[in-house]
Amino acid sequence: MDMLDPGLDPAASATAAAAASHDKGPEAEEGVELQEGGDGPGAEEQTAVAITSVQQAAFGDHNIQYQFRTETNGGQVTYRVVQVTDGQLDGQGDTAGAVSVVSTAAFAGGQQAVTQVGVDGAAQRPGPAAASVPPGPAAPFPLAVIQNPFSNGGSPAAEAVSGEARFAYFPASSVGDTTAVSVQTTDQSLQAGGQFYVMMTPQDVLQTGTQRTIAPRTHPYSPKIDGTRTPRDERRRAQHNEVERRRRDKINNWIVQLSKIIPDCNADNSKTGASKGGILSKACDYIRELRQTNQRMQETFKEAERLQMDNELLRQQIEELKNENALLRAQLQQHNLEMVGEGTRQ
């Protein structure tokens, strides 16, 4: 977009912009730069708003940018909200005295949010205005918030001094509808016509969204500081490390003994060196096998005890039979009887 060089006088800048618009025609994009300076409310009231007669064709295109610059780098920008009617845009009536100054304000230079707010009767073409609109009832239009204008497309004024405050205003149609805001006003002249461009921080305008509350911290945060250790803490730390080392050594020694006791693990350990997990796994298998063998041995032992008792009973019966046989032999000898078995045996 073509932009005129900034002048020290606001009226001269506006006149130059109007002259350029007549030279380029209604189809060319226009840019207007205004400069106002002031440090307090008194300077704001004394600053006059000079708006020259600009033809309606000059504002036919909505790609119009308004840029505010400070007279000194990093200073405050004093700006005002003005209302321009169709008659003033068409060149009808008084061009300077009929301008209605809504309010003035000042802010420090830096990145600010730009908010565009439409009011009822905003079918008019945008006029050169910027600042906060006083509260009162009016129908809202979509707004567009632009952070740090001219940051991603390059400033129209290439020779601008770095560090100065710059604020641009775009129509809502070129930026896109992002949200809506309610603007209240009590002045009937504000609802008569014209479109207002409001420049302020987003917190002052975007109050329709729900605010998320953050719970306060219940206890204070106390970061750990490693540099405040006492000799006692160092001694306790050393003792703890020594105890832990001894415990690990004992565990390793017992695992080595297990590897020596288990037959298969001892053979594997001598070759490749089994790990602790492998040693413990084979130890569990060996213990399980020993338990099964012990159970079988218990059953066998019970059977042996039962057989032993049976043998004892049989032995007793044999002794009784031997005694009975000896008595019978003695009786036969008393009666001089020979046993048939013995005679034939002889």
Curated annotation (Swiss-Prot):
InterPro entries: bHLH_dom (IPR011598), HLH_DNA-bd_sf (IPR036638), USF (IPR051732)
Biased composition (Basic and acidic residues): 226-244
Region feature (Disordered): 1-44, 215-244
Highest rank taxon of the organism: Eukaryota
Keyword set, alphabetical order: DNA-binding, Nucleus, Transcription, Transcription regulation
Compositional bias (Low complexity): 11-20
Gene3D superfamilies (UniProt xref): Helix-loop-helix DNA-binding domain
GO BP term, pick one: regulation of transcription by RNA polymerase II
SUPFAM superfamilies: HLH, helix-loop-helix DNA-binding domain
GO CC, any one term: nucleoplasm
Tissue localization of expression: Ubiquitous.
Region span, Leucine-zipper: 307-328
Recorded GO MF terms: bHLH transcription factor binding; DNA-binding transcription activator activity, RNA polymerase II-specific; DNA-binding transcription factor activity; DNA-binding transcription factor activity, RNA polymerase II-specific; protein heterodimerization activity; protein homodimerization activity; RNA polymerase II cis-regulatory region sequence-specific DNA binding; sequence-specific DNA binding
Domain spans labelled bHLH: 235-290
Classification via SMART domains: HLH
Compartments reported by the entry: Nucleus
Signal peptide start and end residues: none
Function: Transcription factor that binds to a symmetrical DNA sequence (E-boxes) (5'-CACGTG-3') that is found in a variety of viral and cellular promoters.
PANTHER family per record: FI24210P1, UPSTREAM STIMULATORY FACTOR 2
Subunit structure: Interacts with MAF. Efficient DNA binding requires dimerization with another bHLH protein. Binds DNA as a homodimer or a heterodimer (USF1/USF2). In vivo, the USF1/USF2A heterodimer represents over 66% of the usf binding activity whereas the USF1 and USF2A homodimers represent less than 10%. The USF1/USF2B heterodimer accounted for almost 15% in some cell.
Protein name: Upstream stimulatory factor 2
Organism encoding this protein: Homo sapiens
